Curated annotation (Swiss-Prot):
The alpha subunit is responsible for the aldol cleavage of indoleglycerol phosphate to indole and glyceraldehyde 3-phosphate. The gene is trpA. The lineage of its organism: Bacteria, Pseudomonadati, Pseudomonadota, Gammaproteobacteria, Enterobacterales. This is Tryptophan synthase alpha chain. Its EC number is 4.2.1.20. Keywords: Amino-acid biosynthesis, Aromatic amino acid biosynthesis, Lyase, Tryptophan biosynthesis. It comes from the Bacteria. GO terms for molecular function: tryptophan synthase activity. Belongs to the TrpA family.
Length: 268
């Protein structure tokens, strides 16, 4: 959890926002996945948001569903994902690592065991996409027992009670949802979200990172202008992977270009 606090402190001192890329672990293969993640970090990623491939991803659009299918085709399992995570942490000791998950994968070997594994490999936060806040108590408790930040989604229509609860129980960062629906670069994020960011700040919530539909530098600037501490981009990155599976060198060149441009937009 401290890695997020350190990151936001350093960025505030530099007057920068955070740019956080999302990819599926093991896409298109475990070895290439590590290459991709090294490339994202070298290009300027401030933190990582990583998915463990799941067979029935309700919140994901087709781009991220296809990434899971590619990982499955390469034989990726949750156990292999944890091996990849351990390797990332060993190479990159300071970058915050977040997981974006589905509850079935957390339940699989028991909630406590899951968070224990996260702590062992150096994961900082876990967001469970299909667990609403009202049902999150057992996950929150296990997360905090193991020093993992529980991340909550703040939807665009959140009422005051929910904002207070998220502020009170969330750690690390707050996932500010641009809009309802599924992920996808085609579905542009809807702003402004200033009122939500203001309320979250008033209630001392963890810094807000805006996600869903963030695919170009102008949207990163808009997120920061609305008061968010940064932006998360997934589908746009996974699309670059999808289009270049057969040309890994070109893939890494394009990923570097994309992340460099998105990170540049966080500098005021």
């Amino acid at each position: 959890m401290e890695r997020y606090q350190q990151l936001f402190k350093q960025l505030a001192a530099k007057k920068e926002g955070a740019f956080v890329p999302f990819v599926q672990l093991g896409d298109p293969s475990p070895a290439m996945s590590l290459n991709i993640i090294d490339t994202l970090i070298a290009a300027g990623a401030d933190a990582l948001e990583l998915g463990i491939p799941f067979s029935d991803p309700l919140a994901d659009g087709p781009t991220i569903q296809n990434a899971a299918l590619r990982a499955f085709a390469a034989g990726v399992t949750p156990a292999i994902c944890f091996e990849i995570l351990a390797e990332i942490r060993q190479k990159h000791p300071t970058i915050p690592i977040g997981l974006l998950m589905y509850a079935n994968l957390v339940f699989h070997n028991g909630i406590d065991h899951f968070y224990q594994r996260c702590a062992e490999v150096g994961v900082d936060s876990v967001l469970i996409a299909d667990v609403p806040f009202e049902e999150s108590a057992p996950f929150r408790a296990a997360a905090l027992r193991h020093g993992i930040a529980p991340i909550f989604i703040c939807p665009p229509n959140a009422d005051d009670d929910l904002l207070r609860e998220i502020a009170s129980h969330g750690r690390g960062y707050t996932y500010l949802l641009s809009r309802a629906g599924v992920t996808g670069a085609e579905n542009h994020g809807q702003l402004p979200l200033n009122h939500l960011v203001d309320k979250l700040r008033e209630y001392n919530a963890a810094p807000a990172l805006q996600g869903f539909g963030i695919s170009e530098p102008a949207q990163v600037k808009a997120s920061l202008a609305a008061g968010a501490a940064g932006a998360i981009s997934g589908s746009a990155i996974v699309k670059i992977i999808e289009k270049n599976v057969a040309q890994p060198v070109e893939m890494l060149v394009q990923l570097t270009r994309f992340v460099t441009e998105m990170k540049a937009a966080t500098r005021s």
